[in-house]
Swiss-Prot record:
It comes from Homo sapiens. This is Protein NDRG1. One of its GO terms (molecular function) is small GTPase binding. Transmembrane segments: none annotated. Ubiquitous; expressed most prominently in placental membranes and prostate, kidney, small intestine, and ovary tissues. Also expressed in heart, brain, skeletal muscle, lung, liver and pancreas. Low levels in peripheral blood leukocytes and in tissues of the immune system. Expressed mainly in epithelial cells. Also found in Schwann cells of peripheral neurons. Reduced expression in adenocarcinomas compared to normal tissues. In colon, prostate and placental membranes, the cells that border the lumen show the highest expression. Keywords: Acetylation, Cell membrane, Charcot-Marie-Tooth disease, Cytoplasm, Cytoskeleton, Membrane, Microtubule, Neurodegeneration, Neuropathy, Nucleus, Phosphoprotein, Repeat.
Length: 394
């Protein structure tokens, strides 16, 4: 089975978090519905932005430990290029129990849901809002939860963007190390070491400090500890790469795996990629990026997400980047990135946008960046080499 790596250079226009900025300053207000929804395994806090449109999926997000939907995703969704996408979709943000802003402490003896149970809470969320399907975006623990949800309910998931996903159970040595570090290390330090790589903690001091302060000042420490314990007690997802003539458990929907090249989750994401269907999976490694690409590289992630969504048949009229236009003007085809690869990510159907009321706009934030083609290799007609797993390094 052959594999191809496509190197695409995308320059980030500007850092999302400037010196002196705080998390609060990054959180743009939207007209939203917020509800605490009762499910099979307790209550979950949900924020719905926009109005769902007919049979169109919503974008459903799930955050990592030490975060909630605001600190994990608002910086990305407030970014101009991402708003081009969210004009087309309602967005449903799910906060793990007790992780939302102002969450009350759980009573003594409260049994926090397992990771499997957190995934089992999501059908109740969709039912509450009358939603039929989602495009999921999960980070870390949230990526695991959405993957489990997709395995259990494939008919409800049209696609997944998985940032820093780890499909494996916590190893015994990792479990022991986390227990020992819990005795000697403050909870914020444990979370920071999960979110950021060592290199990033030295080079991105301001961002790391901002998130450390969020953990200290805004998160309920008891509730956070319960969520961390649930994540560290997760089961192996037991997924396998499908082989002809065999029945295997794996994702049925398209998946975009995202990881920064200096993220502590690199090995886990590569492992996950090896277990998924190569005709439906793209691995996106971001150069000069740490553990939170949605924070430090929003332009790259928004660009990747746009073409991923287009590959599912949406956003046919999305604007072209300057590099894409320059290639067209010079007679250079997008497929030059991968000779025979077909552009299935641009054969879209029609749809409308609901998250924000924006019309056409200029692509100022990507005018200096490069076009990213993330169409997975799916064995185009005439190609007898078999399926290829695609990796994109940017």
């Amino acid at each position: 089975m052959s594999r191809e790596m496509q190197d695409v250079d995308l320059a980030e226009v500007k850092p999302l978090v400037e010196k002196g900025e705080t998390i609060t300053g990054l959180l743009q207000e939207f007209d939203v519905q917020e509800q605490d929804i009762e499910t099979l395994h307790g209550s979950v806090h949900v924020t719905l932005c926009g109005t769902p449109k007919g049979n169109r999926p919503v974008i459903l997000t799930y955050h990592d430990i030490g975060m909630n939907h605001k600190t994990c995703y608002n910086p990305l969704f407030n970014y101009e290029d991402m708003q081009e996408i969210t004009q087309h979709f309602a967005v449903c943000h799910v906060d793990a129990p007790g992780q939302q802003d102002g969450a009350a402490s759980f009573p003594a003896g409260y049994m926090y849901p397992s990771m499997d149970q957190l995934a089992e809470m999501l059908p109740g969320v969709l039912q509450q809002f009358g939603l039929k399907s989602i495009i999921g975006m999960g980070t870390g623990a949230g990526a695991y939860i959405l993957t489990r949800f997709a395995l259990n309910n494939p008919e409800m998931v049209e696609g997944l963007v998985l940032i820093n996903v780890n499909p494996c159970a916590e190893g015994w040595m990792d479990w022991a190390a986390s227990k020992i570090s819990g005795w000697t290390q403050a909870l914020p330090d444990m979370v920071v070491s999960h979110l950021f790589g060592k290199e990033e903690m030295q080079s991105n001091v301001e961002v790391v400090h901002t998130y450390r302060q969020h953990i200290v000042n805004d998160m309920n420490p008891g509730n956070l500890h319960l969520f961390i314990n649930a994540y560290n007690s997760r089961r192996d997802l037991e997924i396998e790469r499908p082989m002809p003539g065999t029945h295997t458990v794996t994702l049925q929907c398209p998946a975009l795996l995202v990881v920064g090249d200096s993220s502590p989750a690199v090995d886990a994401v590569v492992e996950c990629n090896s277990k998924l269907d190569p005709t439906k999976t793209t691995l996106l490694k971001m150069a000069d990026c740490g553990g939170l690409p949605q924070i430090s590289q929003p332009a790259k992630l928004a660009e990747a997400f746009k073409y991923f969504v287009q590959g599912m048949g949406y956003m046919p009229s999305a604007s072209m980047t300057r590099l894409m236009r320059s290639r067209t003007a010079s007679g250079s085809s997008v497929t030059s990135l991968d000779g025979t690869r077909s552009r299935s990510h641009t054969s879209e159907g029609t749809r409308s946008r609901s998250h924000t009321s924006e019309g056409t706009r200029s692509r100022s934030h990507t005018s200096e960046g490069a076009h990213l083609d993330i169409t997975p290799n799916s064995g185009a007609a005439g190609n007898s080499a078999g399926p290829k797993s695609m990796e994109v390094s940017c």
